[in-house]
Regions:
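Short alpha-helical segment of the dimerization/phosphotransfer core of two-component systems
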Residues: 70-75
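Short conserved segment of the HATPase_c
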Residues: 185-197, 237
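PAS/GAF-family sensory domains
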Residues: 9-20
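Helix-loop junction within the histidine kinase core
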Residues: 86-97
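Short basic (Lys/Arg) and small-residue
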Residues: 27
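Short alpha-helical Gxxx[C/S/T] motif in the catalytic ATP-binding
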Residues: 210, 214
């Protein structure tokens, strides 16, 4: 019995050591990625600011200003996403629940997304599927997740449309979704899209943190996330909340 107890203690210590080492490895990888991701827009801002000072043609100046503005937006988004992740990691993410008219909120989300959409060839539409629906839910976090998923759809949809909405699933869960007619995702890549700093298209702008934050927020609210996709036809990102 003494030997068995000692053996179990040794196994527990080995397991704890392996978990600690894996945690340190993930933190190191996170910091390395974060350093690279911050440096990229900063270099563009600094570099094109210097070039802008010497530019003479109005068209040339406008081009450099647009590049600087885009990288300013990217840097701000990156810092915001990192701050959100730090709250999630430390367990200090705040949740304030209130009674909410979902149809009214989704109309607001639709209007906001339409204002952000730069590609006029891809309309964004909210599809109401339920009559008046008032639920006790976390407004800010629901808006955050829907906005992140819509932003992701905008980046990869060049023609067609983007639709979103919600419906009752079974009797205990609400099912929320964003469907696009974008490039789609290969089967072997689906499991990676919710990882940190994952960008399936290295040329697309973004932090690679948005979907990871979505997953963390939804799981903190007791739900789950997923994606259904077909290459060349589009994707549906979804999540459920109790």
């Amino acid at each position: 019995l003494v030997i068995t107890g000692r053996k179990k203690m040794e196994e527990d210590l080995i397991t704890a050591k392996e978990k600690a080492e894996e945690s340190n490895r993930l933190k190191s990888a996170f910091l390395a990625n974060m350093s690279h991701e911050i440096r990229t827009p900063l270099n563009a801002i600094v570099g094109f600011s210097s070039i802008l000072a010497d530019a003479e043609e109005p068209e040339e100046k406008e081009e450099y200003i647009n590049i600087i503005e885009n990288n300013n937006t990217l840097l701000l988004q990156l810092v915001g996403d990192i701050l959100e992740l730090s709250k999630i990691e430390s367990g200090t993410l705040e949740f304030v629940f209130s009674d909410l008219d979902l149809n009214a909120l989704f109309k607001e989300i639709e209007e906001s997304a339409q204002l952000r959409q730069k590609n006029e060839a891809v309309p964004i539409r909210y599809i109401p599927e339920m009559p008046d629906c008032t639920v006790n839910i976390e407004r800010n976090r629901l808006t955050q997740v829907m906005t992140n998923m819509l932003n992701n759809a905008m980046k990869f949809t060049y023609s067609g449309s983007i639709t979103f909405g919600y419906r009752l699933k079974d009797t205990d869960f609400l099912y929320f979704y964003v469907t696009d007619t974008g490039c789609g995702i290969e089967e072997d890549k689906k499991d990676t899209v919710f990882g940190r700093f994952v960008k399936l298209d290295s040329f697309s702008q973004g932090t690679g943190l948005g979907l990871s934050i979505c997953q963390s927020v939804v799981e903190n609210l007791g739900g789950s996330v997923g994606v259904e996709s077909e290459p060349g036809k589009g994707s549906t990102f979804w999540f459920t909340l109790p």
